[in-house]
């Protein structure tokens, strides 16, 4: 089975296993955390860094870090790409300089099939024989994928030929959103993808510790990537305040009786030993 077939099979299996049907996927961060149990964080990173999956085999812990970006469709592709590495357990893959490993190629294909399943595309477009950029826009807006991913899928499903695919792959999402009237939605997506985001399970544990008075507001603020003041205000509005640490006080009357044996002091000591 080639890489494309492996990726498609895994994407179909993932959707089936988690009863996702053919519909567009919503919050991918929450989806990955809930289905895999792994922590996912949206973090600051260099412009050339998109995502990274780290795995500790000794503790069986996996962490996925994704760069925050004003390009929401790219971020969704990166999230799906890193999910592929988790599902295929690509922990030890090595890439030669200047080339892309088979694992990376397979992860790209998985992301495309997961985000835009062929049957879902056919369900949206039906038996149309001729498509326009308005149809491309509808696919991009519905499934929240890049025009490049949409164009590849449309070509694979034989809605368009290779020449149109190449033309449409050069279009960016902002162009489509502006032309077809959903720029406001796109800007809302940009706001979400360009914001830091702490792993939900880790943040929940930290907030629980804050409530118990053993985790500081600074720790919460660091996780959320904001100020201490904002963290405290946000928690207070939710009715979450730290419990004061109560140090038990014990009075002398509460202490148990202590018996001291002083009999050894009564032993006569020899005088002027020689």
Residue ranges and their predicted role:
Residues 1-274:
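Active-site hotspot residues in diverse enzymes, especially metal/ion-binding acidic/histidine motifs
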């Amino acid at each position: 089975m080639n890489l494309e077939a492996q990726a498609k099979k895994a994407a179909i299996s993932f959707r089936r296993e988690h009863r996702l049907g053919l519909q567009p996927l919503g919050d991918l961060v929450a989806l990955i955390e809930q289905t895999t149990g792994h922590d996912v964080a949206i973090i600051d990173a260099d412009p050339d860094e998109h995502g990274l999956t780290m795995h500790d085999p000794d503790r069986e812990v996996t962490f996925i870090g994704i760069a925050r970006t004003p390009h929401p469709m790219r971020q969704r592709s990166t999230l799906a790409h890193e999910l592929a590495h988790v599902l295929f357990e690509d922990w030890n893959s090595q890439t030669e300089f200047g080339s892309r490993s088979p694992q990376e190629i397979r992860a790209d294909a998985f992301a495309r099939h997961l985000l835009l399943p062929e049957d879902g595309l056919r369900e949206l477009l039906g038996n149309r024989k001729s498509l326009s950029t308005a149809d491309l826009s509808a696919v991009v807006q519905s499934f929240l994928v890049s025009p490049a991913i949409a164009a590849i899928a449309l070509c694979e499903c034989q809605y368009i030929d290779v020449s149109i695919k190449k033309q449409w792959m050069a279009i960016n999402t902002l162009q489509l959103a502006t032309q077809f009237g959903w720029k406001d939605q796109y800007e809302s997506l940009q706001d979400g993808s360009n914001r830091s985001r702490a792993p939900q399970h880790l943040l929940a544990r930290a907030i629980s510790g804050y409530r118990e008075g053993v985790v500081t507001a600074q720790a919460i603020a660091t996780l959320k990537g904001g100020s201490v003041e904002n963290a405290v205000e946000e928690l207070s509005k939710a009715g979450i305040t730290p419990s004061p640490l109560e140090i038990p006080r014990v009075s002398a009357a509460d202490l148990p009786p202590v018996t001291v044996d002083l009999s050894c002091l009564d032993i006569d000591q020899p005088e002027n030993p020689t």
